[in-house]
Amino acid sequence: MGQKVNPIGFRLGVIKTWDSKWYAEKDFAKLLHEDLKLKSFLKKRLYHSGVSKIEIERAAGKAKINIYTARPGLIIGKKGSEVETLKKELAKLTDKEVYLNIQEVRKPELDAQLVSENIALQLERRVAFRRAMKKSVTSSLKFGAKGIRITCSGRLGGAEMSRTEWYREGRVPLHTLRADIDYGFAEAKTTYGIIGVKVLIFKGEVLSGK
């Protein structure tokens, strides 16, 4: 079970929480679609800002969006000019008042989504996949990860037949629900086709009562 399922979804309600923090009865489907639209728009708009996670909170016709990023300066801009433009764009998209909260990711080497996007970017720049994987594994362990596993799937190195290669170092206990495992997925669009990159980072165990 732990081998197949998304590690974050598997731990929801145990040690992980939801990214959409709101409750609705009648308009649930409408708000859910709005959440997906917002996340898709922000991911494209802030592609080079290293966005790790987007959380959405709603109350009384207003939306508060928490953006976790490795490069907050790029989103905020000079004297907050960029963030104001972004607020207006989001308000136009949703017809609601939108609040933005930009949070910095202090250690991007321990964020699975950022690591996977970084590897995908390297693959697009024609860096050898094994080199990109090993470099990311080394830096994550250096910054305190207990274990990391990286999987690349596709026409690796321009091979005729697609295959899957993975590299693991340390422990990655997928069946242990108290294990704090971060998961990230990214796609590298190369001249040979799309290469999928999955990253699992084990940060330690979350003990009850803490």
Swiss-Prot record:
Key word RNA-binding present: yes
Pfam families: KH_2, Ribosomal_S3_C
Domain KH type-2: 38-106
Record key words, sorted: Ribonucleoprotein, Ribosomal protein, RNA-binding, rRNA-binding
Record GO terms (molecular function): mRNA binding; rRNA binding; structural constituent of ribosome
HAMAP family: Ribosomal_uS3_B
Family per record: Belongs to the universal ribosomal protein uS3 family.
Record's protein name: Small ribosomal subunit protein uS3
